[in-house]
Amino acid sequence: MKIKKTGITNKEKIIKKLESEGFDNIFVWCDNPGTFYDWHTHQYQEVRWVYKGEIIMGTEDGEVILTEGDRLDLPANTKHWAKTQRGVCYVCGSKK
């Protein structure tokens, strides 16, 4: 799990950056307060870039709080979970 504090919170800039890095299946997602995703994996490398709110992400190595402007890169097949208490909006992308 790699986290970068980019300071970028503009959706359009985030999407263009991910496109330039070869990510596809790029979309915007928002979760309401109290949303929880149990342990799961993704087949491909994944990115989650928060532009509003905050989310807690956990792996077998621990957990982190992602806030506005934070980018999380997850290698393919990384077992993880996520929850938000306040609500969050982020840009998602995948790379094969």
Regions found by a protein language model. Give the residues of each.
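A short, N-terminal "cap"/entry segment at the start of jelly-roll beta-barrel domains
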Residues: 1-29, 38
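A cytosolic small-molecule/anion-sensing beta-strand core signal
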Residues: 51-52, 68, 86
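Short acidic-glycine-tyrosine-enriched beta hairpin
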Residues: 60-77
